[in-house]
Amino acid sequence: MAGAKIGIFGGSFNPVHLGHLVLAREAFWQAKLNQVIFIPAKIPPHKKEGVISEQHRFQMLRLALKKYPEFSVSNIEFLRDKPSYTFDTVEELKLLYPHDELYFITGADGLLEITGWYRGEELLKKIPIIAVSRAGVSKEVFLNQVQYLKNRYRAQIIVVEMPEIGISSSLIRQRIREKLPYSHLIPVEVYDYIVANNLYR
């Protein structure tokens, strides 16, 4: 019996917002996945400044995902004492899900940088990639990178189209600091949690 097709969606999620959910939904439907696992990073190697605690980010993800049975959140990276790298996470998840097909989900911006990641070239050969188009990266540049990685590393890449949504976690943090409206950019449960815990101020 064939295993499940599971997408791995890592990030800071600082905080999780509607753009993350749209990206995951598009990847889920277009790549015909059975499940998407959100994996918040404990110590993002490239985002050390302004990252709130893993407990807050994990709880916000749980609240944001509770309506979606096909989505789950894992604390696998929180259990490490060292910075979290995608390659290490994929290695661990392959051991945890030996009978399933794992896919790594990334945006167009991540795809442009992936060969510079820790063991990024090996990652391309280890797991199929679901690459999602994203505002800020032109379609031509995105598709050229897809073709380059396929040719250079024989990477398996599934291209997913996504509506342009100009939402980022940094935008939300900025709006909170500047006391501008932001509730329309995140799930209501996440908004309530941020307010209740006085985060990002």
Swiss-Prot record:
Its EC number is 2.7.7.18. Keywords: ATP-binding, NAD, Nucleotide-binding, Nucleotidyltransferase, Pyridine nucleotide biosynthesis, Transferase. It catalyses: nicotinate beta-D-ribonucleotide + ATP + H(+) = deamido-NAD(+) + diphosphate. One of its GO terms (molecular function) is ATP binding. It comes from the Bacteria. PANTHER family: NICOTINATE-NUCLEOTIDE ADENYLYLTRANSFERASE-RELATED, PHOSPHOPANTETHEINE ADENYLYLTRANSFERASE. Belongs to the NadD family. HAMAP family: NaMN_adenylyltr. This is Probable nicotinate-nucleotide adenylyltransferase. It comes from Carboxydothermus hydrogenoformans (strain ATCC BAA-161 / DSM 6008 / Z-2901). The lineage of its organism: Bacteria, Bacillati, Bacillota, Clostridia, Thermoanaerobacterales.
